[in-house]
Regions:
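Acidic (E/D-rich), amphipathic helical modules within compact regulatory domains
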Residues: 3-7, 11, 29-32
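Positions within the helices of HEAT/ARM-like alpha-solenoid repeats
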Residues: 1-2, 31-33, 62-64, 92-95
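Amphipathic alpha-helical scaffolding segments comprising HEAT/armadillo-like alpha-solenoid repeats
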Residues: 14-26, 45-57, 76-88
């Protein structure tokens, strides 16, 4: 249920949605964090920059991949250095997402 809420918040685009989604990045369930990460990227919620950078280092590769894609959508220059550092990720899907994100930031 919280997964769907995170997805819906990303579609609504209400001003308070971004803050709620950043809070959802700390949820106990990784699926909720995944949906929140996607939604933050969709909203281009710049205040989520630091939280998404932190998610870029998560142990679950799917979250790292989505964080990279969301960082690309934010279009914030502060994401470049962490994305460059993530180019060596052990997961090829994460590396692909990092390349996509970096191309969006150029």
């Amino acid at each position: 249920m919280r997964e769907e809420a995170a997805t819906t918040l990303g579609k609504v685009g209400h001003a308070d949605a971004g803050a709620a989604l950043v809070e959802a990045l700390g949820d106990d369930y990784w699926q909720v964090r995944l949906r929140a990460t996607r939604s933050l990227g969709r909203l281009r919620y710049a205040p989520a920059l630091d939280a998404l950078i932190e998610t870029l280092g998560h142990r679950i590769s799917t979250l790292r991949k989505e964080a990279a894609l969301a960082l690309g959508e934010l279009n914030e220059r502060g994401a470049i250095a962490p994305l460059l550092a993530a180019q060596d990720d052990g997961d090829p899907e994460v590396r692909k997402a990092v390349r996509i994100a970096l191309s969006q930031l150029q």
